[in-house]
A protein has these predicted regions:
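Aromatic-lined carbohydrate-binding surfaces of glycoside hydrolases
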Residues: 1-243
Length: 243
């Protein structure tokens, strides 16, 4: 089940509680054993020297732990939805030029260049810190392409980065997953990391992504769970519109 709150959901769980007790009771009665919640890692763990972008992270971590423990009482695990390492506003890169990836001017931000050392080191550190602070977490669910600016090839635009343009897109995905896996399992060896193949393609125009998916899978850590999208290659029809 997806707990539908999105954004900065852990800052005030009294005003906006994503999993109230009555909802958890209903979930448990229906046999639901897990919920996933949107999380933004820099709001839970700061980048050293740029703590101003993470104000309130201590409160968020405490609240996350409270929610995870509450869900656990009902036999339900919280899985954090991670789309990381999340791109940051331009001001962040003025202080951290060694993080800077491709420009995303429509969002007034950049992606993080994971061909550089620091973004992946921080991703591992942040995952370890979050799962240490909230030990009742069941795991995480990762989308590594599309969605939000993350690494330089998140939207198939690695050619705009001099460090990433000649690298295999499969390696860029696998390195992000590996960093998160190391961090999560350093603090919580029993946690599950589920990795979705959403938008996995060599190029954005590709219609057959099977070979590329195989390349990524072959590079993933052996102790993650792979999730495929059920509608790949399926004909669809909604409101008279076929797809």
């Amino acid at each position: 089940s997806y707990a539908a709150s999105c954004g900065d959901i852990f800052i005030d769980i009294e005003k906006r509680d994503p999993v109230p007790e009555n909802l958890l009771q209903q979930y448990a009665s229906m046999g639901i054993r897990g919920v996933w919640m949107h999380a933004i890692l820099y709001l839970l763990h700061p980048v050293k020297g740029s703590e101003e972008f993470s104000r309130g992270y201590e409160t968020r971590l405490r609240n996350l732990s409270v929610l995870a423990e509450r869900c656990k009482k009902y036999g339900i695990g919280i899985y954090l939805y991670l789309n990381e390492p999340r791109g940051m506003p331009y001001a962040f890169y003025e202080k951290n030029p060694d993080w800077a990836g491709v420009d995303v001017p429509r969002n007034h931000m950049r992606a993080n260049c994971t061909s550089r050392q620091k973004p992946l080191e921080w991703l591992e550190e942040a995952c370890a810190a979050v799962f240490e602070a909230a030990p009742a977490l069941a795991g995480a669910f990762m989308i590594t392409m599309s969605e939000n600016p993350t690494h330089c090839n998140y939207a198939f635009n690695k050619t705009a980065c001099p460090l990433c343009r000649d690298r295999d897109g499969a390696d860029l995905i696998a390195e992000v997953v590996a960093a998160a896996e190391r961090g999560i399992h350093a603090s919580s060896p029993g946690a599950k990391l589920l990795v979705s193949d959403w938008a996995w393609r060599e190029k954005g125009t590709d219609t057959d992504n099977a070979a590329f998916k195989r390349k990524v899978i072959d590079r993933l850590p052996k102790n993650v769970w792979f999730m495929s999208i059920s509608e790949w290659g399926k004909e669809t029809g909604a409101g008279g519109v076929k797809g």
